Amino acid sequence: MAASHSPFTRFVHGESFAGLLLVGTALIAFIWANSPWRETYFAAQHTHLALSLGDARLDLSLEHWVNDGLMAVFFLLVGLEIKRELLIGELSSRRRVALAVTAALGGMLVPAALYTALNVGGPGLSGWGVPMSTDIAFALGVLALLGSRVPLGLKVFLTALAIVDDLGAVLVIALFYTSGLNLTFLTLAALTWGAALYAGWRGAFSLKLYGVLGVLLWFFVLKSGLHATIAGVLLAFAVPIRRPDPADYLASLAEAAKPGRGEVVGARLRDLEDLLERAQSPLHRLEHALHPFVTFLVLPVFALTNAGVPVAAGGFGSVSLGVLLGLLLGKPLGVVGGAWLAVRMGMASLPRRVNWGHMVGSGLLAGIGFTMSLFVSNLAFDDSVLLTQAKLGVLLASVLAALLGAGWLLLGIRGQAPSGRDDVQVDLPR
């Protein structure tokens, strides 16, 4: 099978387009926020929308609906991808997961340490989590633009790295950017999640069931004081990945295919449709359904809502510098250092056709923080000046990381032979 038809290559192309779409919407937002019409941008951000159901009422600004509501769907997709990769994907192999985890840990700890060193004792210290994340869509978008110059094993590694990175970001948000918990709603959220876990354990295949439980979980988490997006990750880990028993499936398929009268045939056709839908696991069906929604709506709307940074409002302070150095310097140092440690200790080896020059390039691209870094910025800062500084640092670092990473990989390390073994098995063109 050609590489263009392999599932992973299709995934990379999808993420690549998402990255290009993010660039476009972010650029529109940035220009709009610094244009003579900038007041309309910020007025739209703070326009309130309310939903009422009986006595319950939820009144949030458009910015909060995007960051707390739509982004919960993004985190649901992230959670589904993490679960899939852990159980049957690139993170299911001990050696592969060791390389991704050590590289991701280095890529989170070193940027956070650099940022902290530059902001210790100052009002911007709470932003230490901002430079810890990698935007998988942006990073893979840059790799896709480089075409065949980049070995597929590097794309697989960067994807696994970003997924572990996302998991780390979720934990950081849950543990360090949460305050003022409401125990009543926290209990209701726990009970709802327990119901979802029980449904998954019992093998419930209805996506509508998980949808209803997900909406309730999101509302309770929002009201509990935890960030609402955590609900997306919690729900993802409840959605089952196993498929129906093949023997039962084939028996039901044979029964539904038997000839009969018109009304019987109609009923059996509906049974066949249901069986075909259930042939895939709920996790795969939900992931497949959410991907275009997140790619074409959630992330572009998030970029449009959050990338409008007025340059003159906050200036370039220690927060901006900490984010910039954390992503541009801390990320490659941490990623390459973590990967080197895993290889040195015999825990892992580099993917096929990937050398240390490639790993430096991937470390530079990991400095494209964009989506997650902007998201954490909103949680870290209440002060508008510090928030503007953080966002300015994220945008500048993401652009520079993309240019430096692409430039490094284009130049190549031609004199250095690939040192990785065939750890990544993929379909290549014949």
UniProtKB/Swiss-Prot annotation:
Write down the InterPro entries for this protein, in alphabetical order: Na/H_antiporter_dom_sf, NhaA
Location, primary (coarse class): membrane
Q: Give the transmembrane region(s).
A: 11-31, 60-80, 97-117, 127-147, 181-201, 215-235, 288-308, 309-329, 356-376, 393-413
Which GO molecular-function terms appear in the entry?
sodium:proton antiporter activity
What catalytic reaction does the record list? Na(+)(in) + 2 H(+)(out) = Na(+)(out) + 2 H(+)(in)
Going by the UniProt record, its keywords in alphabetical order are: Antiport, Cell membrane, Ion transport, Membrane, Plasmid, Sodium, Sodium transport, Transmembrane, Transmembrane helix, Transport
Instruction: Say if the entry is tagged with keyword Transmembrane helix.
Output: yes
Q: Give GO terms for biological process.
A: regulation of pH
Q: How does it sit in the membrane?
A: Multi-pass membrane protein
The UniProt entry, under Pfam families, shows: Na_H_antiport_1
One GO cellular component, as annotated: plasma membrane
Cellular localisation? Cell membrane
* Cited function: Na(+)/H(+) antiporter that extrudes sodium in exchange for external protons.
**Entry's family note:** Belongs to the NhaA Na(+)/H(+) (TC 2.A.33) antiporter family.
- Write down what this protein is called: Na(+)/H(+) antiporter NhaA 2
Q: Which organism is it from?
A: Deinococcus geothermalis (strain DSM 11300 / CIP 105573 / AG-3a)
